[in-house]
Amino acid sequence: MIMQEFEVVSRVDKDVSNRKEVLLMAIDFKEPTFIKVRAKEDVTDHTKVYSDGKKCYVGDKIIGEVLSVKNGSDVAVNTKYDIKYTGGYSLDGKTVYLDEHFPPVLKIQGKEIDIRKTIGLHHELPEKWMADEDYEYPYAHEVATGIEKKYVESLGVTWKAYCDEVDKNLRQVYSRTLEKSPPSLDLAPYLYCRDREALGEIRKSES
């Protein structure tokens, strides 16, 4: 039996017929994968849990059943559009977008870091997964940043060095006026931030 390790990122208490259950949201940062678990007992955030795709375990103990699984294996990373926040995702979650002007690979501390993976599959995708579970943008973004950080550090570079290099390019991207935006872009982050300027540019540049 192949087991995959996840970290619990959120918990929701449920009362079902006078019986308490907990919905657990957990993510594997190494190979970006999301599971939603119906658990019979609670665990704390950041608890390491394991799953075979059907059951969820803490150690050798079964704590619940997996209700849904999402992973990045069938998600496309598209770099052919202008994206005001550098990264984004389609409404259906099947495509992650990165701004075409953002370098796809950055040289950081002597290593080549693929932004399509760090920002695309290890930030934007987890953020979309959380948003689709009705978490508000700030919390979804916070969880996604944590996943991105764990992945980046696993590559052997420091989070500070990574952020310093990324931020240089983020400022350049945001200063540009959008020329072409994907028609399927999920606008939830812009709407939450009430970024009217960005929303106006996106609507004008949709192709």
Predicted regions, residues:
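Intrinsically disordered, low-structural-confidence terminal and linker regions
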Residues: 2-43, 47-58
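Metalloprotease/metallohydrolase-associated module, dominated by Zn2+-dependent proteases
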Residues: 32, 40-46, 54, 62-111, ...
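Active-site recognition of the HExxH zinc-binding catalytic motif
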Residues: 119-131
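Generic low-polarity alpha-helical segments
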Residues: 22-24, 117, 121
